[in-house]
């Protein structure tokens, strides 16, 4: 991408973030990871929403998009899911745990009320 990752004091962390993302992809591919569950709203791991600016400020701002590591995982062929994709995670649990039934009321993050009100529309890469 074209974005930069800046630390709380304005230090450019982009190169380190890319280095970490590359390491994450190599490790995931070596371990034959098929699905990564990552923390959304993160400059590294956001799958739908990322911080706009430093995450340590009193009032955070957000934008639609994917984090550095998420973008690299997607490019490496690894599916990424947000920890807030409750419906998808519950459906996966149904497959892994006989007898578990996902609630029909669960929603994935793109359907969350806050997400819909503050950042309408889906990010094309998510």
What is each stretch, according to the model?
Residues 28-32:
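Glycine-rich phosphate-binding loop signature in dinucleotide/nucleotide-binding domains
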Residues 44-47, 89-91:
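Short catalytic/ligand-binding loop motif for oxyanion handling, primarily in non-cytosolic enzymes
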Residues 39-43, 85:
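Short, well-ordered beta-to-alpha junction loops that form the rim of enzyme active sites
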Residues 5, 46-57:
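Surface-exposed, active-site-proximal loop segments in enzymatic domains
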Residues 34-37:
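Structural motif
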Residues 2-23, 27, 59-126:
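Divalent-metal-activated hydrolytic enzyme cores
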């Amino acid at each position: 991408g074209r974005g930069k990752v800046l630390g709380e004091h304005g230090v450019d962390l982009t190169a380190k973030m890319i280095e970490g993302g590359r390491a994450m992809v190599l490790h995931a591919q070596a371990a034959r990871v098929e699905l990564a569950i990552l923390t959304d709203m993160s400059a590294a791991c956001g799958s739908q929403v990322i911080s706009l600016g430093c995450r340590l400020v009193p009032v955070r701002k957000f934008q639609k998009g994917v984090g550095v590591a998420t973008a690299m995982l997607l490019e490496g062929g690894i599916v990424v899911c947000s920890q807030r994709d409750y419906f998808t995670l519950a459906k996966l649990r149904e497959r892994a745990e006989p007898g578990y039934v996902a609630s029909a009321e669960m929603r994935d993050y793109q359907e969350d009320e806050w997400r819909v009100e503050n950042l309408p529309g889906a990010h094309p890469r998510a």
